[in-house]
Regions:
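N-terminal "arm"/small-domain region of PLP-dependent enzymes with the aminotransferase-like
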Residues: 1-26, 31
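Conserved donor-binding loops in enzymes that form glycosidic bonds
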Residues: 7-8, 87, 137, 185
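Conserved active-site segment immediately N-terminal to the catalytic lysine
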Residues: 160-195
Length: 197
């Protein structure tokens, strides 16, 4: 038996919608994207949504906001700021951290959920820690009660890479909305997709 990473699941309606976009000559941004952003934000209970070409780019955008708009950081003027991240994730979760000038401080996972261990996070926080990146792996939400508690106590920002868990909930709230910012992915191999995004 063969298992494919992805396969063509486009309906006639979806193909017709893609054709409309192609015929319009407006391939990026535009009315359809604006409508999607508004509906996406409303559905998932977020104030805002910004569409990018991929979850990888969304992660880079999220970290760039912290680099270029440090007012969002709770700790100011840290010389060597670090962000705590789980030891299991995707390279596209980690590269943006270092690309934007932050050090990555890896911590171990909880073996039952495969997500970041709140106990390990608490022990890893030091004077240069400015944030926690929680990655909701394979539809499993992190322990946000504990992560928020740690972030509040230690004056840190909480960020989410929700690219692998669109539609997951933690205590009746969609993941991707637990911290300051969260990212999602609609890549072709995911359960809900827009081809590349």
């Amino acid at each position: 038996m063969k298992y494919f990473l992805a396969y063509n699941s486009w309906s006639k309606t979806e193909i017709a919608e893609v054709a409309k976009v192609l015929k319009s000559g407006n391939f990026t941004m535009g009315k359809k994207v604006y409508e999607f952003e508004k509906k996406f934000a409303k559905y998932f209970g977020s104030k805002f949504a910004v569409m990018t070409n991929s979850g990888s780019s969304a992660n880079l955008l999220m970290m760039s906001v912290l680099k270029y708009f440090p007012k969002f950081l709770k700790k100011k003027k840290i010389k060597n700021p670090n962000i705590i991240a789980p030891a299991i994730g995707w390279s596209t979760s980690y590269f943006p951290i270092s690309q934007c000038g932050f050090k990555i401080k890896f911590v171990d996972i909880n073996i039952k959920s495969l997500n970041i261990s709140a106990k390990k996070v608490e022990k890893a926080v030091d004077k240069n820690t400015v944030g926690i990146l929680a990655i909701n792996l394979l539809g499993n939400p992190c322990n946000y009660n504990r992560l928020k508690e740690i972030a509040d106590k230690k004056n840190l920002i909480l960020l989410e890479d929700n690219c692998e868990s669109l539609g997951s909930k933690y205590k009746n709230k969609y993941t991707g909305n637990m911290g300051l910012m969260g990212t999602h992915s609609l890549y072709f191999a995911h359960h809900i997709q827009t081809m590349e995004g």
